[in-house]
Amino acid sequence: YSSQLAQVQGLIGNVESQLAEIR
């Protein structure tokens, strides 16, 4: 379960970094 949570956090971080690039 913890590994799945880490995957979700990594995915969110990736999306946030992409949004930062757009801005």
UniProtKB/Swiss-Prot annotation:
Keyword Coiled coil assigned: yes
Alphabetical list of PROSITE patterns matching this protein: IF_ROD_2 (PS51842)
Record bears the keyword Methyltransferase: no
Protein name (record): Keratin
Family in the record: Belongs to the intermediate filament family.
Span list, region Coil 2: 1-23
Cellular compartments per GO CC: intermediate filament
InterPro entries: IF_rod_dom
Domain IF rod: 1-23
Keywords attached to this entry: Coiled coil, Intermediate filament, Keratin
Top-level taxon of the source organism: Eukaryota
Miscellaneous field: There are two types of hair/microfibrillar keratin, I (acidic) and II (neutral to basic).
